[in-house]
């Protein structure tokens, strides 16, 4: 399954995606 990082980064990254999506688009993990 492909993760839609653009969609994920429109909100805060979930912890599951943070390592993948945040690395690409620098979104902020929840709780920070």
Curated annotation (Swiss-Prot):
Keywords: Allergen
Domain of life, per lineage: Eukaryota
Tissue expression notes: Expressed in pollen (at protein level).
Similarity section: Belongs to the GASA family.
Protein's recorded name: Cypmaclein
Natural source organism: Cupressus sempervirens (Italian cypress)
